[in-house]
Amino acid sequence: MATHGISQVTTHGRRCAVAADDPVAAAKIAAPDVPVWAVQRPRITKLIAEDVRWCQLTVVTSPPGAGKTTALALWAAADPGIVAWVCLDEFGNRPGVFWSYVVAALRESGVTLPRALAAAMRGRVGGHMFLLQLAAALAAQDPPVTLILDDLHLLTAPKVLDGLDYVLRNVGSGLRLVASSRTDSLLPVHRYRLAGELAEIRASDLAFSTAEAGLLLAWHGSTLTAGQLECLTRRTEGWAAGLHLAAVSLDAHPDPDQLLRSLPRKAAR
């Protein structure tokens, strides 16, 4: 991927910069590393791929540790096309910060943005002219780009959310938005649901099946009987973090049955 140096924008008289050679900034616009213990889950990868193909907005909602980010990273690594990734934090509630990272992520993914957008960025980032220019640029994108916003629940500022909704409603087929969140999104998802443009992936979809749990434990070198594996999957309800913690514990536990009996429901989720 190309390196684009520093992208600077002005917001309320202050400069916001995204530097490609800044490791902190670079981490914000890069897909996180997939954990070494993560197992391939074709069922989930296919589900995400189909949702992104047919819907403009895909929201992956589940509690911590359910595997949202890992599932999206595995899908993104499967070469689904042009993918831009933004790891959100509380600072994203400042329009200048949020849109700086979005633009940097789009450029890093290979999307060419017109000079008119650069001119708009010298104005008030997040203002109408900037959003209009960004939406117009993305509407012309062919093939479409998928923008992943990880940890969307951290975005609570109405101005940022309204701007994101505006762009999404005016890009046609040029943009697909995929968001992971611990809570239901503050975006007006009902509008996309009514239009048939919303796909929702929940904790129940991300839950490991018994077979998938077996693959995870096999990676750790743990061997359970079919009954023990079913018990573990049932007690953790397929919760990814719980299964991982149980697998680590099994490595050092001499009696799997005793460990399984002591395991609380949902592994203390």
Language-model-detected regions and their locations in the chain:
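Conserved adenine-nucleotide phosphate-binding loops and their immediately adjacent elements
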Residues: H12-I48, R115-A119, L215
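Loop-to-helix "switch" segment enriched in basic
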Residues: A20-D21, L138, T183, R193-L194, ...
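Conserved phosphate-binding/catalytic loops and adjacent sensor/switch elements of nucleotide-binding enzymes
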Residues: P64-A66, T70-V145, L154-T156
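Hydrophobic anchor at the beta1->P-loop junction of P-loop NTPases
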Residues: V60
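Short, conserved phosphate/pyrophosphate- and ester-handling motifs at nucleotide-, phospho-/glycolipid
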Residues: R41, T69, W239
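A conserved switch/coupling segment of P-loop NTPase cores
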Residues: A49-R53, A77-P80, G127-L206, A213-G214, ...
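Long, basic/Gly/Ser/Thr-rich N-terminal segments
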Residues: M1-V9
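Walker A (P-loop) ATP-phosphate-binding motif of ABC ATPase nucleotide-binding domains
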Residues: L57
